[in-house]
UniProtKB/Swiss-Prot annotation:
Organism listed in the record: Oryza sativa subsp. japonica (Rice)
One cellular component (GO) term of this entry: CCAAT-binding factor complex
Gene: HD5
Gene disruption: observed consequences: Early flowering phenotype under long day (LD) and natural day (ND) conditions. Decreased plant size, number of grains per panicle, yield and dry weight per plant.
Protein name, as recorded: Nuclear transcription factor Y subunit B-11
Protein keywords: Cytoplasm, DNA-binding, Flowering, Growth regulation, Nucleus, Transcription, Transcription regulation
Length: 297
């Protein structure tokens, strides 16, 4: 079996910082142009990590070949096969490409006295290295990524602000105050998303998903009614009275009544086939989630 060839050196652009597996002595010698390290076509050849002659660790220089193989198979027909030699060739090319682009972007950051390489730096480096044809599509991917990250930050920030407001007022968590404020949680938020997904089947069958929850003390009942086609779940918290008996009546369907039970309570099987039970417990920003029981009258 043909053995994999091992390289005892790596190429990095002149002036770029040494890679993680390069020793400080080798990097200093390369920058000074001595110590047995030569340069070729504007690139400095660094010795292997620490020992000079010892090659760098393979896992530090190359992407996992299994990942490379999976990516290659995505572009091939189902009956196509890939030789070991082709996998290793792509693995080495892609790994070296990452080193070249990162080194070029690092030079730009050093000139601008910045420590963090961002996506724009990498796209600039690819343009400098002659990959202009790929920069356009990658810019669109970068913009999509930033938009997704921005939306995620907005959702998390909005949920955190609502929780802080509840803590500050002390109406539902501190036991004081006669009413509870309504809270709107986006469907993409982890907990709200779980609620909307778990009740999606009920929305298909019953035309509406109903759930109730209690927050903090025992006098603030909260319920929601998710309309069809809506990705945002609106929670409303009417003031609980003695007559309501810890029940939340969800708008739009008068036959749906939600009863609250403690976390330690036992689950009861609903009579007939129409009753479905939902139980979950957790603690988020001081909000205590209680076991819920859904009854159909």
């Amino acid at each position: 079996m043909k053995s994999r060839k091992s390289y005892g050196h790596l190429l990095s652009p002149v002036g770029s910082p040494p890679l993680d597996n390069e020793s400080g002595e080798a990097a200093a010698a390369a920058a000074a142009g001595g110590g047995g390290c030569g340069s070729s076509a504007g690139y400095v050849v660094y010795g292997g990590g620490g020992g000079g002659d010892s090659p760098a660790k393979e896992q530090d220089r190359f992407l996992p070949i299994a990942n490379v193989s999976r990516i290659m198979k995505r572009s091939l027909p189902a009956n196509a096969k890939i030789s070991k030699e082709s996998k290793e060739t792509v693995q080495e090319c892609v790994s070296e490409f990452i080193s070249f682009v990162t080194g070029e972007a690092s030079d730009k950051c050093q000139r601008e006295k910045r420590k963090t390489i961002n996506g724009d730096d990498l796209l600039w480096a690819m343009t400098t290295l002659g990959f202009e044809a790929y920069v356009g599509p990658l810019k669109s991917y970068l913009n999509r990524y930033r938009e997704a990250e921005g939306e995620k930050a907005d959702v998390l920030g909005g949920a955190g602000g609502a929780a802080a407001a509840r803590h500050g007022e002390g109406g539902c968590c501190g036991g004081g105050g006669g009413g509870a404020d309504g809270v709107v949680i986006d469907g993409h938020y982890p907990l709200a998303g779980g609620l909307s997904h778990s009740h999606h089947g009920h929305q298909q069958q019953d035309g509406g998903g109903d759930v109730g929850l209690m927050m903090g003390g025992g006098d603030a009942g909260v319920g929601y009614n998710a309309g069809a086609g809506s990705t945002t779940t609106a929670f409303y918290a009417p003031a609980a009275t003695a007559a309501s008996g810890n029940k939340a009546y969800c708008g739009g369907d008068g036959s749906r009544v939600m009863e609250f039970e403690g976390i330690g309570g036992e689950e009861e099987s609903g009579g007939g086939g129409g009753g479905g039970e939902r139980g979950f417990a957790g603690h988020l920003h001081g909000v205590q989630w209680f076991r819920l029981k859904r009854n159909t009258n």
